[in-house]
Regions:
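Active-site loop of classical SDR/Rossmann-like NAD(P)-dependent oxidoreductases
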Residues: 29, 51, 307-319
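C-terminal helix-rich "cap/oligomerization" subdomain common to oxidoreductases
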Residues: 1-17, 83-86, 285, 321-364
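Conserved SAM-binding strand-loop segment of SAM-dependent methyltransferases
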Residues: 65-72
Length: 364
């Protein structure tokens, strides 16, 4: 199979710089992922604001952003800003979006961070506010734009793997917990596992029920309940999915040798795909990988490769899908409305682990 036949990167129109982007936040994910990808894609960033204006000024100088605002409320007044890109902790994001919708005369789209909110009820409120204001809301579920993940989705959509039977993700990696995560009622489930849960939805659709188990991470010193997460998803068509989200990985920071990495696998009735995820090597930009084999071509593995990496290149896809949606007046694939089902799944996993029981998705 020729690499050019695999839909591993979203196709974008060439005139998306017609939209002015305003950025709220100046942390590393904005500085080193969002803005790097936007520069490479030719998107037009008009201004930036942060609760730390000095850091916003540093990022603006580094990434060529013309205007630094002392407060995001000043940024919202600029009529040349049609798109808001939010990069703030999840507990602060809903309040900012409630203010953004008051500027619907010129604001046409919002790219929110994941999780959209820390509860289904609040996420639903935000989605409905944006819909009422006529503002297109997208949620930055950027794992969908990891190139191996998107490539696997293409294989599934084209039927090359047949009917999905089993999907697994085996994560042995150490996230960099930000200080703001100490204030959340959930750590790994809403911050880390949400990537894999949304990925399973992207590949297989919505599950009927879930089972989960969790325990604290020995390395993380602040109080939390959900560090290491184990969970199983059951789908109506018989497909099953499971992830081991191991943020401990053994005492590798405490003196032992390490075995860090993320491997995924999708088995179907007509083929098998497997891959690796490159982000544990960050800040080294390491492309993810995809190998697959089918019953029709059973004598070898096909191994398409690419130079792009999840960090930063996937962020071209999330902002690009929002800009395309605004331009063509269509819902983005990562719409806020769709993301409610991801939030429901995350809450179901958290509940299943907390209450030690099977949770049906309609409960949420």
């Amino acid at each position: 199979m020729n690499l050019l036949d695999l839909d591993y990167e979203v196709a974008l129109d060439q005139d998306l710089n017609q939209f002015g982007i305003g950025v709220i936040g100046a942390g590393f994910i904005i500085r080193d992922c969002h803005l790097v990808a936007y520069q490479q894609a030719g998107f037009r960033v008009v201004g930036i604001a942060s609760r730390n204006p000095a850091r916003a000024a540093e990022v603006a100088l580094l990434r060529g952003i013309p205007t630094v605002y002392q407060h995001y409320r000043e940024l919202l007044k600029n009529p040349d800003i049609q798109i808001l890109d939010i990069g703030v902790p999840p507990q602060h994001q809903p309040a900012i979006i409630r203010e953004i919708v008051q500027h619907a005369k010129h604001v046409r789209g919002i790219l929110a961070q994941k999780p959209l909110a820390m509860s289904y009820a609040e996420a639903q409120e935000i989605v409905e506010l944006c819909e009422s204001a006529g503002i297109t809301l997208a949620v930055n579920q950027n794992m969908r734009h990891d190139h191996s993940v998107r490539g696997c989705r293409d294989l599934l959509q084209r039927g090359l793997l047949g009917e999905p039977v089993l999907g697994t993700i085996d994560m042995r990696a150490i996230p960099h917990w930000m200080p703001w995560s100490q204030d959340l009622h959930s750590l790994s489930t809403f911050v880390m596992s949400i990537h894999h849960l949304d990925c399973f939805r992207y590949w297989f659709g919505d599950p009927q029920r879930v089972m989960a188990s969790t325990r604290p991470d020995p390395r993380t010193k602040f109080s939390h309940t959900d560090g290491i997460n184990l969970y199983i998803l059951e789908f109506a068509n018989g497909c099953r999915a499971s992830s081991w989200d191991d943020v401990w990985t053994g005492p590798v920071r405490e003196g032992s040798q390490g075995d860090i990495g993320i491997h995924w696998r999708v088995e179907g009735t007509a083929g098998l795909a497997r891959g690796t995820i490159g982000w544990p090597s960050y800040p080294a930009a390491t492309p993810s990988t995809l190998d697959f084999t089918t019953r029709e071509r059973g004598d070898y593995w096909l191994q398409p490769r690419w130079k792009q990496a999840w960090f930063p290149d996937a962020f071209r896809g999330t902002m690009g899908e929002l800009l395309m949606a605004v331009k063509h007046q269509t819902p983005p694939p990562i719409s806020g409305r769709d993301n409610l089902r991801t939030i429901a799944l995350v809450e179901a996993i958290f509940t299943a682990a907390k209450e030690h029981r099977v949770v049906e998705l309609p409960e949420i």
